Amino acid sequence: MEKPIVLVIMDGVGKGDGGIGDAVVVAKTPTLDHLLATCPHTYLKAHGTAVGLPSDDDMGNSEVGHNALGCGQVYSQGAKLVGESIENGTLYASETWKELVANAEGKAMHFMGLLSDGNVHSNISHLIALLKQAHAEGVKKAYCHILLDGRDVPATSALEYVEQLETVLSELNTEGCDYAIASGGGRMQVTMDRYEANWGMVEKGWRTHVEGLGRQFASAKEAIETYRNETGCIDQDLPAFVVARNGEPVAKINNGDSVILFNFRGDRAQEISLAFDRKDFDKFDRPGYTGVKFAGMLQYDGDLNIPEHYLVQPPVIKNTLTEVLCEAGIHEYALSETQKYGHVTYFWNGNRSGKVCEELEVYEEIPSDVIPFEQAPAMKSAEITEKMVENMASKKFQFLRCNFPNGDMVGHTGVMDAVVYAMECVDNGLKAIIEAADQYGYTVLITADHGNADQMTETKKGKTSVRTAHSLNPVPFIIYDKDHQWVIKEGSYGLANVAPTVVKMMGLTAPECWEDSMI
């Protein structure tokens, strides 16, 4: 092994068009600019089929991105798995689906999840397929608890999806049936917290969906239009709402009902799953709750058994980079703040909690701020940098990885000035890590998991608007080594080529199932 290796993941930093909406270029980033001008580098595909998603129209995300980075292979991912299991009928043949349908006799079936076709956390087509199948199998009452997106899709597109869903529900309202939207709210306000950053969001979702508490409206459309006029918020930030008839909620989630969480992505599905699933749940009070028949679209964490019941078998990712390095006795260090800590650990390790080898691995989490990221766009970049430099100086580890979340988390706010500042903070971190690499003798690899900050605007039909979703742009892969001029082979590469490159640099043998090394 020539040198220990540091991998820096600049979350949400792709190669944009260099225009006024490209915060990566607009920002003053002298370190990144210098690295791109002087170091071996290429650009990696970070979306679509390169990361296991159904088509190249599908934007990448941090989950599938870190899976690919950490396992050196392209696996069929959530959206693709679910789509296949719906098409071939295996979902409806599962014991879990059969139990949910049987249980709904004389009761209600509830569908909860993100309402869009963003294909990052969910897809409305999956919800519609499940609703139609439930109706075909005799379920009389089905209610939707919808979380509004505006993050993986255009910022104010919620009404398009609501209208699409309402059309289907009206078709399913045949004699004796009641199919309706019961509650909802913006995904960054209710239900979809992750990494235990803000349990208050989940509690708000519980009060809204389960207890039917909250401001009432005659329809989801009325709620969205009213809140937009009152608050000026984009979809992801709209407050919670309850749909009512004659002053009463259309549907609460009652004890004994069937409940399906139709999101396929794990990070923002785990907390609400725990609230439904666990008898010993203690994050907030659940007055009168004795339990429902609950299932997730996938199992979101196999090691922690979240949830206990699920409709589609998740990808079992074997032969990860961590497994290869542990087998070789390599000491590893993984670091980020709360918002991306799970990405450099759980997702990196193939959707598994815990460590492969306690003796060889150290994971460190810096708690994230619980304030809007546009108000503090530096996030914890300084603290991440300090910890990385400290651990490089210790020389305890041969492979260190960190994630700077700024480009993605601030990118999602759509506030250009904040994103530009966020990028400058990441560049400051890079500078210190490069200096430490020179001082202590490391090779540094710099990449990203997907784009976001590189495309902050989009133009449709001649109209330019703020973009808050990930981009389809490739991401940089840079090799910095002051003592060795590495040569990147010609070719077309994706995120899954990073792990093989790390192993090659270390002089180790990659598993046969892996993609090729870039060097």
Predicted regions and their residues:
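Feature captures the catalytic ectodomains and active-site-proximal regions of enzymes
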Residues: 1-519
